[in-house]
Structures are given as structure tokens and as C-alpha cells.
């Protein structure tokens, strides 16, 4: 059933010419070098420190590792992160 719903959203997105991140409820991540990251379509902050940001996603979590991380702006579905970004990892729900 989950696959059918996902497939239906993909088809609807194609017909309506909607961006895939909106249709599939996945994050859109924009990086400027290794110094800045803009993340859209998250569901909340689970953990933040100067070395790690952990965000809740519809289908799991997004983990950003780095040094001297700072949240410059945060909105209900958007985060602007600055610092030395070292890595990004997706954890899918089982």
C-alpha cells in the first residue's frame, strides 16, 4: 500500500509539474561549499550541538556532522545551518 501511494504521488507530481521534494515529502538540501546548508521539508529538530544537527524527516532522520555549527535561522519546515560541515547522513525508518 505504501508503494502504491508513493507511485501515485510521483505520477501526480509529473502531471501537475510539481517538484519531487514536495510530492515525495523528502528534504531539499542546498549547500554552499562546506560552510552553509539550507534544509527544507524537515519535521523538527531532534538534537543540536556545535558538532551535530539531527532533524526529523517524514521517512526518518537527517544527521549533519561538523564543527562550530550554528543555526542562523529556523522556521517550521526550514533550517539555515552554518559552520564547517563535515558530513550528511540519512537514516530511514525501518
Predicted regions and their residues:
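N-terminal intrinsically disordered, cationic/polar leader segments
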Residues: 2-94
Amino acid at each position: 500500500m505504501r508503494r502504491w501511494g508513493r507511485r501515485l504521488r510521483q505520477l501526480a507530481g509529473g502531471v501537475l509539474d510539481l517538484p519531487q521534494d514536495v510530492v515525495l515529502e523528502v528534504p531539499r538540501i542546498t549547500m554552499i561549499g562546506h560552510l552553509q546548508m539550507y534544509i527544507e521539508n524537515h519535521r523538527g529538530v531532534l538534537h543540536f550541538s556545535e558538532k551535530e544537527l539531527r532533524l526529523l524527516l517524514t521517512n526518518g532522520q537527517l544527521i549533519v556532522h561538523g564543527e562550530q555549527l550554528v543555526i542562523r535561522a529556523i522556521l517550521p519546515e526550514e533550517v539555515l545551518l552554518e559552520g564547517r560541515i563535515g558530513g550528511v547522513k540519512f537514516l530511514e525508518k525501518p
